[in-house]
Curated annotation (Swiss-Prot):
UniProt keyword annotation of rRNA-binding present: yes
Keyword RNA-binding: yes
CDD domains tied to this protein: Ribosomal_L11
GO cellular component labels: cytosolic large ribosomal subunit
Post-translational modification summary for this protein: One or more lysine residues are methylated.
Known partners and oligomeric status: Part of the ribosomal stalk of the 50S ribosomal subunit. Interacts with L10 and the large rRNA to form the base of the stalk. L10 forms an elongated spine to which L12 dimers bind in a sequential fashion forming a multimeric L10(L12)X complex.
Source organism: Fervidobacterium nodosum (strain ATCC 35602 / DSM 5306 / Rt17-B1)
Protein name in the entry: Large ribosomal subunit protein uL11
Length: 141
């Protein structure tokens, strides 16, 4: 018989740097998960992606065991890194926070393709371009 799912917890953690301190501790500790075990497994899986923010969905079962799925970094994080800025524009349509090239957008779209609801690379690029514009980034050729 399958294990009963008690909770699904969504977290965004820096790759290879999960610790039992907040936000991991409070989110998973109250569900009875072994925090050190989660941190070791997460850090091992994401060790090659150092410096990236990785969304993770942790499924907790009734016997206190867990599984987790890592996703690709958020598009906004990747766009900010590509444009070399700390935050998007406070007034996206009026103030330009930075610039990204179509080549950078293509690279981000290729990376995000598995998590996006897009059939091809062109559609994925349009989604990423929309995110860039809503952050106040200018898309240049």
């Amino acid at each position: 018989m399958a294990k009963k799912v008690v909770a699904q917890v969504r977290l965004v953690l820096e790759a290879g740097k999960a610790t039992p301190a907040p936000p991991v501790g409070p989110a998973l500790g109250q569900r009875g998960v072994n925090l050190m075990e989660f941190c070791k497994k997460f850090n091992a899986v994401t060790a090659d992606k150092a410096g990236l923010l990785i969304p993770v969905i942790v499924t907790v079962y009734d016997d206190r065991s867990f599984t987790f799925i890592t996703k690709t970094p958020p598009a906004s994080f990747l766009l900010k890194r590509a444009a070399k800025i700390n935050s998007g524009s406070s007034e996206p349509k009026r103030k330009v926070a930075g610039k990204v090239t179509r080549q950078q957008i293509k690279e981000i779209a290729e990376l995000k393709m598995q998590d996006l609801n897009a059939n091809d690379l062109e559609a994925a690029m349009k989604i990423i371009e929309g995110t860039a514009r809503s952050m106040g980034l200018e898309v240049v050729d």
